[in-house]
Amino acid sequence: EQQRFYVLTIFIPATAAVAYFTMATGFGLTEISVNGQVLDIYWARYADWLITTPLLLIDLALLAQANRNTIYTLVGLDVLMIVTGLVGALAATPAIRIVWWGISTALLVFLLYFLVQSLNEAASRQTESVRSLTTTLRNMLIVLWLAYPVVWILGTEGTIGLIPLYVETAAFMVLDLTAKVGFGGVLL
């Protein structure tokens, strides 16, 4: 049963590894000026998320045997969330950055609500082991994904800037490793 997830799941950490390699070697980075301060924005992180987060959702939806409309809705909300987060990171004024962060975070909340509602319904028709695994993976994603906008707003990409770039990058890396490699380890 779990073998059908191997191919899809292996692309999640593989894509993240490529993105982190590009960031580590100085690519996937752009500088923007916000209030006279130059900020390093790792756009490769968003490229990674644009690929890997839909794959995580597809994996989870396939496990629960959700229908196509559910999968399309989850992926559509996810793509909008990532793109609006990137727009916020690239915005040159603090107020606009906060607005885009708010839009992206609202999309995240709506996505997570839809994820719970739709996957509970789909998984309810599956075996107890599938329901349990779906619930575990879903809850794992919810907890981890709720941390991303907090790191964003407190870090250099947000306007608060309480945590420096290296701490922000490390926090995103830990979240990504847990959400991607951890997810795959639990699923497979």
Explain the meaning of each model-derived region.
Residues 1-44, 53-188:
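Polytopic alpha-helical membrane-helix bundles and their juxtamembrane interface segments
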